[in-house]
Amino acid sequence: MTTIPTSTAPTGARASLRRALAALTLAATPWSAIGAAAPAQAIDMVAARWEANGALAFSTQDGFPRGLMTVKGPGAILKDVLFTNGTIEYDINEDGDEDETSGIWFHQRDRATAEYVYLRPAPDCPGSVECIQYGPVVQDHVQWDVYPEYQASAPVRQHGWNHVKLVISGKRMNVFINREATPSLQVGHLESDSPSGQIQLRGNATYANVVVTPDAVEGLAPAPSIDPTAADARYVRHWQLSPASTIAIDTELGLADMLEATALAATTPWEPIAAERKGFVNLSRSHGTPRGAPDLVWLKTTITSERAQTKQVALGFARQVWIFANGAPVYTGKNFYYPAAARTTPLARMTLDNGTFALPLVAGKNEVVMAISNDLRSRGHYGWGFAMRLADIDGLALPGVKPAM
């Protein structure tokens, strides 16, 4: 039987053409679009690959074929890599880091926005819940103190090398320490405003064996985990927010300050602000916190009650609050990080365990006003905001909450 060729080109030439076309098609297609990870990129620890954001030193040593990089604050940015999803691995030695905050920024959009993972080696690791921590970098501040759910124990060695592996997929991240089979830290919702960006190694530490594998997500779903508070109507989620001002340390606010602040709303408009996940009203995201004197903002909302009654309120906050209901003070609270004796449970992190108070309500509309400052009593500012939850909403109407049918 005679075979009729489909092309007049020689067989070898046709095969070469097919291979070339396939290669061009693959090169133009994102690896994620074909359900595969891109090749792993082992990064040389040489000056040509890293942009200094601080002092860097490069060296060689047996057992580290691509070299070592020692960072002496603030960090080193990996050149020519824009990372979205995939795996980042590295070895880190933090023996010279007294602050115990060396780690990695990824999805870095600028010097004020990124995701941050760091280790805190200590003698009580892996038992301590502070051995590994995640915090978003928002408005140039690390919000570690308002996301205690993203701090965990881990098999971290106090001295010498630790291996870190991050798997990032969409809004989720798993972190594995020292090649463990299961993640020490699972982040269900990455909290910065940047879905992709640069990679930066931070702190006072030595790094080696950096490998970046785009789109290698190991089956981790990109969708965020469910917000456990989403269906909880007891959270007071909708407020009006004043412009920010500054407040001197140790200043106490009273009724006269509240009346003056609310009177200014007639000439200086307040803006609406709504709670994020877990009922958190995130002031850092909207206002930021310049270093120096602590910032102060005022917020107000209206709760409508069918009758005169009193409700118990759980409050998580960072750092100092004054609350008024219908023109009368009902609660003041402090959640400083320094001195250690001033820390509320748990370890000055923001949770609903920080404070509780009784909220007296009259029949009809009730105006609740809050002042909150970001006085950490330390050299910088971190997370800033609050979450407020009523014990129940029987007989109440909250802003933004549809009445039960």
Question: What spans do the regions from the language model cover?
Answer:
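An acidic-aromatic loop/edge-strand motif
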Residues: 219-223, 352, 356-405
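Carbohydrate-binding surfaces in secreted/extracellular proteins
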Residues: 157-186, 320-329
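Short carbohydrate-recognition loop motifs
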Residues: 57-74
